[in-house]
Regions:
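Nucleotide-sugar donor-binding/catalytic module of glycosyltransferases
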Residues: 1-165
Length: 165
């Protein structure tokens, strides 16, 4: 068992996938698996995944018929070996090397089942903070339209499975 399974749903992402995976490879936390779910891509995403798998033994690739990112994420949760899971879409990236380590430290320190961090939206060189994480306590995001930003969260895998999330 590893600490974190990073689940990457992949669909026709040959142009962005290498950058996304590189941002996972550079993480300071190395006790991770990178679980890529190829969701029926028709481009060269499979070639990028094969290359990544050869380059880094933490990469594990699964292939399925196209069923959508949600189904790919759920398959990733079911197949994951990590105590925690994180999601990273194939067109997103972790902005620095300490993202997973910081989230894991916060989750273990607090005992939280779900732990989140900051979000920045970038378009070219234009970067805007959308949510800034502080350590002052729990921030309720229920009233904010942030539900699509899976990459900012770390989830206790057992919590997701037990609650069928």
């Amino acid at each position: 068992m590893c600490k974190i399974s990073v689940i990457v749903p992949v669909y026709n992402a040959e142009d962005t996938l290498e950058t996304a995976l590189s941002s996972v490879f550079m993480q300071t936390l190395t006790d991770i698996e990178i679980l890529c779910i190829n969701d029926g891509s028709t481009d060269h995403s499979a070639d990028v995944l094969t290359s990544a798998q050869r380059r880094d033994g933490r990469v594990r690739c699964l292939t399925q018929e196209n069923a959508g990112a949600g189904v790919a994420r759920n398959r990733g949760i079911a197949e994951a070996k990590g105590e925690y899971v994180a999601f990273l879409d194939a067109d997103d990236l972790y902005p620095g090397p300490y993202v997973l380590e910081t989230l894991l430290t916060a989750a273990e320190k607090s005992g939280a089942m779900v732990c989140g961090g900051s979000i920045e939206k970038a378009k070219g060189n234009d970067v805007h903070p959308m949510f800034v994480f502080t350590e002052e306590g729990v921030h309720n995001t229920c009233d904010e339209p942030l539900d699509r930003f899976f990459a900012r969260f770390l989830y206790k895998r057992s919590f997701l499975l037990e609650n069928r999330l």
